[in-house]
Curated annotation (Swiss-Prot):
<feature type="binding site">
    <location>
        <position position="57"/>
    </location>
    <ligand>
        <name>Mn(2+) 1</name>
    </ligand>
</feature>
<feature type="active site" description="Proton donor">
    <location>
        <position position="116"/>
    </location>
</feature>
<comment type="subunit">
    <text>Component of the Sca1 complex composed of at least gefA, gefH, scaA, phr, and the protein phosphatase 2A subunits pppA and pho2B.</text>
</comment>
<keyword id="KW-0464">Manganese</keyword>
<dbReference type="GO" id="GO:0061509">
    <property type="term" value="P:asymmetric protein localization to old mitotic spindle pole body"/>
</dbReference>
<feature type="binding site">
    <location>
        <position position="165"/>
    </location>
    <ligand>
        <name>Mn(2+) 2</name>
    </ligand>
</feature>
<dbReference type="InterPro" id="IPR047129">
    <property type="entry name" value="PPA2-like"/>
</dbReference>
<dbReference type="Pfam" id="PF00149">
    <property type="entry name" value="Metallophos"/>
</dbReference>
<keyword id="KW-0378">Hydrolase</keyword>
<keyword id="KW-0479">Metal-binding</keyword>
<feature type="binding site">
    <location>
        <position position="83"/>
    </location>
    <ligand>
        <name>Mn(2+) 2</name>
    </ligand>
</feature>
<dbReference type="GO" id="GO:0090443">
    <property type="term" value="C:FAR/SIN/STRIPAK complex"/>
</dbReference>
<keyword id="KW-0488">Methylation</keyword>
<dbReference type="InterPro" id="IPR006186">
    <property type="entry name" value="Ser/Thr-sp_prot-phosphatase"/>
</dbReference>
<comment type="similarity">
    <text>Belongs to the PPP phosphatase family. PP-2A subfamily.</text>
</comment>
<keyword id="KW-1003">Cell membrane</keyword>
<comment type="function">
    <text>Component of the Sca1 complex, a regulator of cell motility, chemotaxis and signal relay. The Sca1 complex is recruited to the plasma membrane in a chemoattractant- and F-actin-dependent manner and is enriched at the leading edge of chemotaxing cells where it regulates F-actin dynamics and signal relay by controlling the activation of rasC and the downstream target of rapamycin complex 2 (TORC2)-Akt/protein kinase B (PKB) pathway.</text>
</comment>
């Protein structure tokens, strides 16, 4: 690695000012990131205390707010549950910063894959267009979407709390099955890899029912409790769904949804949260509103377009 062109501390400092990195540097950091991620398992083992972060969707100034509230990396151990890009105005800066932080402090930050870490989805919901506007070509989008194929898909805190972007799959009811999935690919339209990134809990259903999102399933309390029992887990923390209060708990407090993008799409008026998990595995939801810069920042995307139903 040529340190004269690639200095992580310099990159992080630049990104914290919301300045994009050169295309050549993006290639270097994504190549290094793939080298790092290939050594990580599908299901990462994490020790408490750890702060868990849900969807951030390119809301860069709110990501900076997360580090102010939760503590800077590496002082705080972080687990991000995916959906770093699309919809927000600064997806490039957001994923660039998180990638650089992962490279700089690999044991203090874990990045999981969300359903938006996908070529197909990012071509529709903003990241591709943002890369084209900011770089004039799709090369940076290609670098990052290739890197997305390497991200882990789940994590376990202290062998007790299962963490994933979306949830459960009828095709992978044991964590051992998730450990052997081939994750090094574009998110498929169906199957276990797709399901765990796309599925949602539903308190009004039992079992698995095909999701109205067009991918994944709605899953009920019964299969959730069975999954926990069979895998000797105590709780599930997941993201993927907008929560007006920033979080939601379901199924006798056995499942939590954490949402970390306040005032989503600059119009939803919702709160956001991060989950602090201590050594006793107690969960504290730290809620926050949109950062002032996010409220005043001029959009680079057309947020007047209709949001797809699955998004809200």
């Amino acid at each position: 690695m040529n340190t004269s062109t690639f200095n992580l501390d310099h990159c992080i400092e630049k990104l914290q000012k919301c300045e994009i990195l050169p295309e050549s540097t993006i290639k270097e950091i994504t190549d290094k990131m793939k080298e790092l991620l290939i050594s990580e398992s599908n299901v990462q083992e994490i020790r408490s205390p750890v702060t868990v972060v849900g969807d951030v969707h390119g809301q860069f100034y709110d990501v900076l707010e997360i580090f102010k509230i939760g503590g800077q990396c590496p002082d705080t151990n972080y687990l991000f549950l995916g959906d770093y890009v699309d919809r927000g105005y600064h997806s490039v800066e957001t994923i660039s910063l998180l990638t650089c932080l992962k490279l700089r402090y690999p044991s203090r930050i874990t990045l999981l894959r969300g359903n938006h870490e996908s070529r197909q989805i990012t071509q529709v919901y903003g990241f591709y267009g943002e890369c084209m506007r900011k770089y004039g070509n799709p090369t940076v989008w290609k670098y990052f979407t290739e890197m997305f194929d390497y991200l882990s898909v789940a994590a376990i805190i202290d062998e007790a709390i299962y963490c994933v972007h979306g949830g459960l799959s009828p095709s992978a009811l044991s964590i051992d099955q998730i450990k052997v999935l081939d994750r090094f690919q574009e998110v498929p339209n169906e199957g276990a890899l797709s399901d765990i990134l796309w599925s949602d809990p539903d308190p009004d259903r039992e079992g698995f029912v095909e999701s109205q999102r067009g991918a994944g399933y709605s899953y009920g309390k019964d299969v959730t409790l069975r999954f926990l029992q069979n895998n000797k887990m105590q709780h599930i923390i997941r993201a993927h769904q907008l929560c007006m209060d920033g979080y939601q708990t379901l199924f006798d407090n056995k499942l939590s949804t954490v949402w970390s993008a306040p005032n989503y799409c600059n119009r939803c008026g919702n709160m956001a949260s991060i989950v602090e998990v201590n050594e006793k595995l107690e969960r504290y939801f730290n809620t926050y509103a949109a950062a002032p810069q996010s409220l005043s920042n001029k959009p680079t995307l057309d947020t007047n377009k209709e949001l797809p139903d699955y998004f809200l």
